[in-house]
Amino acid sequence: MKEKTIIIVGGGQAAAMAAASLRQQGFTGELHLFSDEQHLPYERPPLSKSMLLEDSPQLQSVLPAHWWQENNVHLHSGVTIKTLGRDTRELVLANGESWHWDQLFIATGAAARPLPLLDALGERCFTLRHAGDAARLREVLQPERSVVIVGAGTIGLELAASATQRGCKVTVIELAATVMGRNAPPPVQHYLLQRHQQAGVRILLNNAIEHVVDGENVELTLQSGETLRADVVIYGIGISANDQLAREANLDTANGIVIDEACRTCDPAIFAGGDVAITRLDNGALHRCESWENANNQAQIAASAMLGLPLPRLPPPWFWSDQYSDNLQFIGDMHGDDWLCRGNPETQKAIWFNLQNGVLIGAVTLNQGREIRPIRKWIQSGKTFDAKLLTDEDIALKSL
């Protein structure tokens, strides 16, 4: 019997790791990856950090260049897909070529959620999703330039740190009452707000742009009535899933391709993962996790499901953020207001713990990354703790 053909659509973390996972799990059939980017699939996290700060930055490939040939994966870079061919099982390219598939994995990622008021500025307005975006930003983030960043989420704050380190004068505008409101607990939000302010970043909370004038500088009038002048304007206010091909194929979508716990779409032969995917939970709610690790996890899950193998057990959600000299790592459940702190954040070394009835369900480390491994095990096992012992620095964590 002829082995099936699997096609991967996308050129990022989830796409590359799906190819790797399929081969690692024993798939020997024909395997293709189609991407609209010219580069080999590359790591996205460095775009807001090392790609802006290093003297001679280089893209970091997810997999070495030789891996693709050695593992007989056919790379099709810089191509545009016209249709997925859900009914015909024939992927069609803009140049007219068609490629048969038996199973499909979609990992087309996401674009920056548009902000029309700023998009009207054209090339004077920036977002950050791809290598080309980072290259353009690197050129304009020059010392003494005035930079306005709209959005104080993870990307916004990382960009604020990088721009400040490049000598720019940075102002951040945030509609909410805090920074990193979606994915950091209150004490970490407080720490990051102070950290950026101490670095010279002006952060304007509970505010938004009402009017923009494009002249020698960009003039931005805020809801508060204040007018800012900027040489560079950047925004990051969320994502818009690149799900157009899926919508045209009549797959279920909701600002993302709706998948189940096996990364399967409403079509049993089509799977999706990474930022383009949104998971329907058992209670019917939709949930998206935008992180490097989630892209890896969903790639592995989809590969297992496509091959009819048991699904891997998911670890607690984890992501990291580098801002200035700080490395913050977030693991587990970030919800809840009753967080404990081990150490002193003012020394830039601390761990915040989230206990629920004595059970550790989440944590954030500040320049204590080596502690993530035991913390991950404790969260997975549902380990209980005495709060006093957990926050006592005289007691080594590994002894608890």
UniProtKB/Swiss-Prot annotation:
Enzyme Commission number:
1.18.1.3
Q: Which cofactor does it need?
A: FAD
**Any keyword GTP-binding?**
no
Example of a GO biological process term: 3-phenylpropionate catabolic process
Under NCBIfam families, the record lists: 3PPDioc_HcaD, PRK09754.1
Q: Which family does it belong to?
A: Belongs to the bacterial ring-hydroxylating dioxygenase ferredoxin reductase family.
Describe, as the record does, how this protein assembles with itself and its partners.
This dioxygenase system consists of four proteins: the two subunits of the hydroxylase component (HcaE and HcaF), a ferredoxin (HcaC) and a ferredoxin reductase (HcaD).
What protein name does the entry list? 3-phenylpropionate/cinnamic acid dioxygenase ferredoxin--NAD(+) reductase component
- Organism expressing this protein natively: Escherichia coli (strain SMS-3-5 / SECEC)
Quick one: which gene encodes this?
hcaD
